[in-house]
A protein has these predicted regions:
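C-terminal helix/juxtamembrane-tail motif
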Residues: 211-231
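Substrate-binding/catalytic groove segments of enzymes
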Residues: 147, 171-177, 203-206
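Short acidic/histidine-centered micro-motifs embedded in hydrophobic/aromatic stretches
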Residues: 100-103, 115, 164, 209-213
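Residue-level detector of short coil/turn "hinge" positions at structural boundaries
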Residues: 32, 181, 204-205
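GST superfamily/GST-like fold recognition
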Residues: 153-177, 185-192, 197
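Acidic-histidine catalytic/liganding microenvironments
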Residues: 200
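GST-like domain detector, emphasizing the conserved glutathione-binding G-site
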Residues: 1-152, 222-224, 231
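Conserved, non-catalytic sequence blocks in retroelement Pol enzymes and Pol-derived host proteins
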Residues: 63, 182-184
Length: 231
């Protein structure tokens, strides 16, 4: 692969946002180089590639950087127009996918992050809020994607990528912080999508190492709680 056509992903191993891009690249069968970034000690290279946000992920293609995970995913789909296509051809279906992706990004991810760093009454309140928002997502999946079948890579699109990257490690989160957010009784459709997606070989290739993730979550949680106690 010459330097001009080379594809490089700058990310971090535990990042949901990086994981989204990894999944898309593997689904499309795109060869790429992965660069692990240390966000506590950002490299000059990362800052130059993403001078506005100075964050990962950044995809470099044809020596040109593309930042922000959702922007990168659409760039991948438009540049490599081979199966699976990440967005449907029908404008209304495409709008629905983008709406629910936005909902997860803006309404669900934030409250789930709060749960990790809270305890007691504050955490219980956030857990309830997270479950309520997931129930809205559940109803949306049943209404707009009632016949969804997930058996192979071609059944995976943008929404499925966001779901598995966001919720794929929910059992590990349960183990690490002792709270179950994705409840099969409350959100059976969402739970089923996650289970089916996890069975695909491509998802197993990008699965986060359980022990390492548990240790990271518990470490972050304890550090945050200690800082809050000392504030």
């Amino acid at each position: 692969m010459d330097e001009k056509s080379k594809v490089t992903l700058h990310g971090t191993w535990a990042s949901t946002y990086s994981k989204r891009v990894e999944i898309a690249l593997k689904l499309k069968g795109i060869l790429y180089e992965y660069v692990e970034e240390d966000l506590k000690n950002k490299t000059e290279s990362l800052i130059q590639l993403n001078p506005v946000h100075k964050k990962i992920p950044v995809l470099v293609h044809d020596v040109k950087p593309v930042a922000e995970s959702l922007v990168i995913l659409e760039y991948i789909d438009e540049t490599w127009q081979k199966s699976p296509r990440l967005l449907p051809e029908d404008p209304y279906e495409r709008a629905q996918v983008r709406f629910w992706v936005s909902y997860i990004n803006q309404q669900v991810f934030e409250v789930m992050s709060r749960v990790i760093f809270q305890e007691g009454e504050a955490q219980a309140k956030s857990v309830e809020e997270a479950r309520e928002r997931l129930k809205v997502l559940e109803d949306g999946l049943k209404k707009h994607f009632p016949n969804k079948i997930i058996r192979e890579n071609d059944d995976v699109g943008l929404l499925e990528i966001i779901i598995i990257a966001t919720f794929g490690a929910h059992k590990v989160y349960h183990e690490a912080i002792g709270v179950e957010i994705v409840d099969p009784a409350n959100t059976p459709t969402l739970y089923n999508w996650i289970e089916r997606l996890q069975e695909l070989p491509v998802m197993k290739d990008v699965e986060l190492p359980r022990d390492r993730l548990v240790n990271l979550l518990q470490s972050y949680r304890q550090k945050h709680l200690q800082q809050a106690a000392n504030a």
